[in-house]
UniProtKB/Swiss-Prot annotation:
It is found in: Cytoplasm, Cytoskeleton; Cytoplasm, Cytoskeleton, Microtubule organizing center, Centrosome; Chromosome, Centromere, Kinetochore; Cytoplasm, Cytoskeleton, Spindle. InterPro entries: NUDE, NUDE_dom. This is Nuclear distribution protein nudE homolog 1. The modification Phosphoserine is found at residues 211, 231, 239, 282, 309. Belongs to the nudE family. It comes from the Eukaryota. Changing residue 243 to E: Loss of centrosomal localization, reduced ZNF365-binding and loss of interaction with MCRS1. Changing residue 191 to E: Loss of centrosomal localization, reduced ZNF365-binding and loss of interaction with MCRS1. Changing residue 246 to V: Retained on spindle poles during mitosis, no loss of phosphorylation in vivo and increased ZNF365-binding. Changing residue 282 to E: Loss of centrosomal localization, reduced ZNF365-binding and loss of interaction with MCRS1. Changing residue 228 to V: Retained on spindle poles during mitosis, no loss of phosphorylation in vivo and increased ZNF365-binding. Changing residue 106 to D: Loss of interaction with RAB9A. Decreased enrichment to RAB9A-associated intracellular vesicles.
Length: 335
């Protein structure tokens, strides 16, 4: 368009101009065609390559789709499994929480039970200590009671021995009274006054024997010469040797034993005086007026000497025996 307004000086110049322009456009056309062919060839190659790539991409896409479908199926399966596991885990967690709550409650109960057991154990230990103390006290009292029983048994044995001795002395006194009565029947004494004096002396000795106060064992007199059984002393030593008695109980027991021994000694002295009385009256028997007096006694019932001596001795002996029995009973109860 720019060339249309151009002016040429000649036609040849214009023809050359147009020839050159035609050649230029022709060259451009050839170049353009060549470029077109190259572009077409490149396009075909590129198209083939694109088709190949497209096929590959489609194949890959199909593979990916199948893989995607498989993965989706797996995802669904995994989701289902996850839901199942989640629900199962939730149930397990709920069960574990319930178990934990129960365990905590059981733990609290066990702790409370342990505290109660500890308190009960403390109470039992205190009760055990109290029981042990009471048992020791009971054993001590039992041992004391056993010792007292042993001491009382020894005293009972001694009482029986003393009663046997008293009975023996009573038998001897009765025999002596019978012998004295026989001798008085056979012979009448010269002077009846000594007999009355001896009877009164015997009665006084018996009354003194019954009224002797309790004195300590250190003041006993004739008890050392009595035939006291050794078993009582051994029993007394054995009973008081393990656990000593209190001083008051020991002094009381010794006083009672000393009094009993003095009473027995007095009874033996009384019997000895009766024997001496019989032996003193035996050489002084006469036959004259004494026989008449004795017959008068048998007839009239006077018999003053024998009535004053023999019944009086029997009465004193019985009184001494009763007092001895009461004293032994009091000693047993006091010990």
């Amino acid at each position: 368009m720019e060339d249309s307004g151009k002016t040429f000086s000649s036609e040849e110049e214009e023809a050359n101009y147009w020839k050159d322009l035609a050649m230029t456009y022709k060259q451009r056309a050839e170049n353009t065609q060549e470029e077109l062919r190259e572009f077409q060839e490149g396009s075909r190659e590129y198209e083939a390559e694109l088709e190949t790539q497209l096929q590959q991409i489609e194949t890959r896409n199909r593979d990916l789709l199948s893989e995607n479908n498989r993965l989706r199926m797996e995802l669904e399966t995994i989701k289902e499994k996850f839901e199942v596991q989640h629900s199962e885990g939730y149930r397990q967690i709920s069960a574990l929480e319930d178990d934990l709550a129960q365990t905590k409650a059981i733990k609290d109960q066990l702790q409370k039970y342990i505290r109660e057991l500890e308190q009960a154990n403390d109470d039992l230990e205190r009760a055990k200590r109290a029981t042990i103390m009471s048992l020791e006290d009971f054993e001590q009292r039992l041992n004391q009671a056993i010792e007292r029983n042993a001491f009382l048994e020894s005293e009972l044995d001694e009482k029986e021995n003393l009663l046997e001795s008293v009975q023996r002395l009573k038998d001897e006194a009765r025999d002596l009274r019978q012998e004295l009565a026989v001798q008085q029947k056979q012979e009448k004494p010269r002077t009846p006054m000594p007999s009355s004096v001896e009877a009164e002396r015997t009665d006084t000795a018996v009354q003194a024997t019954g009224s002797v106060p309790s004195t300590p064992i250190a003041h006993r007199g004739p008890s050392s010469s009595l035939n006291t059984p050794g078993s009582f002393r051994r029993g007394l030593d054995d009973s008081t040797g393990g656990t000593p008695l209190t001083p008051a109980a020991r002094i009381s027991a010794l006083n009672i034993v000393g009094d009993l021994l003095r009473k027995v000694g007095a009874l033996e002295s009384k019997l000895a005086s009766c024997r001496n009385l019989v032996y003193d009256q035996s050489p002084n028997r006469t036959g004259g007026p004494a026989s008449g007096r004795s017959s008068k006694n048998r007839d009239g019932g006077e018999r003053r000497p024998s009535s004053t001596s023999v019944p009086l001795g029997d009465k004193g002996l019985d009184t001494s025996c009763r007092w001895l029995s009461k004293s032994t009973t009091r000693s047993s109860s006091s010990c």
